[in-house]
């Protein structure tokens, strides 16, 4: 999607809005972490003889505390081979080569950004991998962005009619349809176009939604409406993905399934290192490298 021309200027209460957004992202993080630990506790199928996983939280500072920071929450368990739920609130100045790529940064390089980012790589190949991210960015303008997308790792499950994909898309569609500022068909198409491996001519997964540069006119609710939609994306994800995990996590799998999973994870690595804007943004703005690259799966295979 082509980047729009966003209005310049910040509202008088921008500090309040920044604080509200930051608090929401951190609250959502805590909710998801608690729900994922409950899933670890409830496993009854393969590997249930192993200890249930628990998140390990690690706080980090950007620029020795002069540019904000965040919290990495990582877990390696018997359901989730690797899952990271991260929040960050950072500020500073964009480097010269990056300013023209960000709305409002060419006029003034200063920025503020807060958000939550999640990636889950389950043990069981029947459970799809997932990614979710929502954020608020402030330059001389301000906007929201984010989305959620599902990546089944078995070819027989990578079809639009698979029950997991149908359920996931329906949850995102309902979240969008509650809000005038959201456009489900547009955001779904945007996701399909964004999460695409051009060099392999194939999608990363079975899609979801993706949006960016969301700054709506006051006539349809402005910042408050955009924030309400962004919250609903997070809430919808926090309900639908645990449901998908619980539907599949006790199912048996074969060594062939595991091999197929590891090859599909290789595609995930290729996308994140070659195309992902969030990865590039984080590395170019002095983000926490360990946190940024934690989205990569723990084990992969290239045939």
From Swiss-Prot:
The keyword Mitochondrion does not apply. GO terms for biological process: protoporphyrinogen IX biosynthetic process. Coiled coil: none annotated. GO terms for cellular component: cytoplasm. Substrate binds at residues 117, 133-135, 286-288. Its main location: cytoplasm. Keywords: Cytoplasm, Heme biosynthesis, Metal-binding, Oxidoreductase, Porphyrin biosynthesis. Pathway: Porphyrin-containing compound metabolism; protoporphyrin-IX biosynthesis; protoporphyrinogen-IX from coproporphyrinogen-III (O2 route): step 1/1. HAMAP family: Coprogen_oxidas. Involved in the heme biosynthesis. Catalyzes the aerobic oxidative decarboxylation of propionate groups of rings A and B of coproporphyrinogen-III to yield the vinyl groups in protoporphyrinogen-IX. This is Oxygen-dependent coproporphyrinogen-III oxidase.
